[in-house]
Amino acid sequence: MRYAPTVLRARTLSIWFAAITVMASGSALAEEVLSDEPADTLKYVVGLAATSSSNYPGSANNEFKLRPLWALQYGRLRISTSRAGGFMSNASETVNPGASAELIRHDRLKIGAGLRIDGGRSPSDDPLLASLPEIRRTLRARVYASYAITEQWGVSTGITQDLLGREGGATALMDTSYRTRLSPQTELLLGGGLSFGNGKYMNSYFGVPQASSLQSGLPAYQPGAGIRDVHAAIGLTTHLSDRWIIFGELNLSRLLGDAASSPLTQKSSNVGGSIGLAYRCCD
C-alpha cells in the first residue's frame, strides 16, 4: 500500500514526536534512579576509521571505506555513528549507532530506547541484486537492555522495528561480552551472539520474488522467520592520552538457517574489521 506524501509526512512527524517524548520521560526517570550522579555535561567524540564489511549479508565481496566517527552525549541522551558512542567513557562500551536514551540505569542493569536510519539495500550494491526490488531507506526504533554479570562479563539483547512500513520488518539479537584490561591504557573486548529476523525482514533481505526470479534466473525463494546469523568479535582499544584513542576490531559472522540457504547467499561466512583513531572530550 502506498501512502500519499502528506499522510507519510504526518506519520513520520508523529513518530518523531513520540520518540522524543519517550526519550525525555526516560531521561527524567533515569535522573530519579541516579540522583547521586554529577550534573549533566556535554561530551563528544570525533575521529576516522578504515572499515571492511560485506557488500550485503551473504555477499562474496567486501567493501573498504574510510568513515568519519562522531558522537554527542548529554546526560543519558546520545547520538552517534557506528562505534563512536562506545568511546564516551574510559571503559569502552558496545553502543549502537543512531539516537538513543538510557531510560533506566540501576546497579548492573541498563534499559534504553533509540532510533536509527537503516540504509536498506540497492540493486546496484552487487550484480546479483540487479533484478531484485530496492529495500528503501527507513527509520528503525530500537529497545535494548544489558546486564553486567560481573565487572568483566555482560549480556545484552535488543529488538528493532521498521517504523515507516518499508518492508524492513523486525530484528532481534542476543549477545554476551567479556572485557579485561591488558594494561592501564589498553582494553581487550571479546563478544559474540545470535541475530534473528521476522518473516518480513527475512523475505526482504534473503527472498527472491517470483517476478525477480524470471528476470534474474535465480530460483524463487521465500524464507521464514528465524535465526539470521551467529557472530563474534575481538577488539582492542588503547588510550594514547586522556583525549586520544586508537582502536582495532575483527568481526566474524556466519549466516544460518533460511538466510544461509538463500539463492542470494554467495558466501555464508564473512570476516570484516575496522581500525581507527578518535578524539574524546570532555569528562
Language-model-derived ranges and their functions:
Residues 1-41, 283:
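Cleavable N-terminal export/targeting peptides
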Residues 29-79, 85-87, 108-110, 121:
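Short glycine/proline- and aromatic-enriched beta-strand/turn motifs that initiate or cap beta-hairpins
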Residues 31-33, 162-260, 264-266, 281-283:
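Outer-membrane beta-barrel transmembrane domain signature
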Residues 42, 62-68, 107, 135-141, ...:
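Residues that define the transmembrane beta-barrel architecture of outer-membrane proteins
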Residues 44, 76-80, 109, 151-155, ...:
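Repeated loop/turn-to-beta-strand initiation elements of outer-membrane beta-barrel proteins
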Residues 46-48, 70, 81, 111-115, ...:
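Membrane-embedded beta-strand positions of outer-membrane beta-barrel proteins
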Residues 50-54, 74-76, 85-87, 115-121, ...:
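Transmembrane beta-strands of outer-membrane beta-barrel pores
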Residues 67-69, 73-75, 176, 268-283:
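Outer-membrane beta-barrel "beta-signal"
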